[in-house]
């Protein structure tokens, strides 16, 4: 049985999860083991209701409030406020790598998850990065 893991780290709307639904259904129909590593378990449970998908909470990073940008007008600003420039970056990457080791997926499907993408540069799990031009950094 193949194992896949979907990730969602940043952003607020259900669109980050809904786009996964057709692929998750197909994988489940193939009898694959499907995981979702998400920032909001409640939203994931609503979207994947009725599917045998394992849902795990991840803790998105953040920069201490005093160091955050007040106005966000670019992707680097979002990354800054999400902990990329904080002392906790190494812990965030280690947490993702730990989750990948625990689950051992054969495929990652990544949506608006920059720390997961960075951690996967180390883990080297085959991956698909999905999203809009804004949520997929170069």
Predicted regions and their residues:
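Extreme N-terminal starter segment of soluble prokaryotic enzymes
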Residues: 1-5
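Conserved nucleotide-sugar phosphate-binding/catalytic loop shared by glycosyltransferases and other
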Residues: 6, 29-30, 34-87
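A short, glycine/small-residue-rich beta-strand->loop->alpha-helix junction that serves as a flexible
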Residues: 8-21
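Histidine-centered beta-alpha loop that forms part of the nucleotide-sugar donor binding/catalytic region
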Residues: 9, 113, 131-134
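Hydrophobic/aromatic ligand-binding patch that stacks against planar heteroaromatic rings
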Residues: 26, 118-119
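Conserved nucleotide-sugar donor-binding subdomain of glycosyltransferases
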Residues: 72-107, 113-115
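Active-site-proximal region of nucleotide-activated glycan assembly enzymes
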Residues: 123-138
């Amino acid at each position: 049985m193949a194992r896949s893991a979907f990730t969602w780290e940043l952003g607020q709307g259900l669109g980050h999860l809904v786009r996964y639904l057709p692929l998750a259904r197909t994988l489940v129909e193939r009898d694959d083991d499907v995981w979702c590593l998400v920032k909001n378990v409640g939203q994931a449970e609503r979207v994947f209701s009725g599917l045998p998908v394992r849902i795990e909470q991840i803790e998105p990073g953040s920069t201490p409030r005093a160091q955050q940008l007040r106005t966000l007008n670019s992707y680097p600003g979002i990354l800054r406020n999400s902990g990329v420039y904080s002392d906790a970056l190494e812990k965030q990457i280690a947490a993702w790598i730990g989750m990948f080791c625990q689950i051992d997926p054969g495929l990652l499907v990544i949506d608006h998850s920059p720390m997961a993408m960075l951690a996967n540069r180390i883990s080297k799990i085959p991956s698909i990065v999905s999203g809009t031009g804004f949520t997929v950094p170069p």
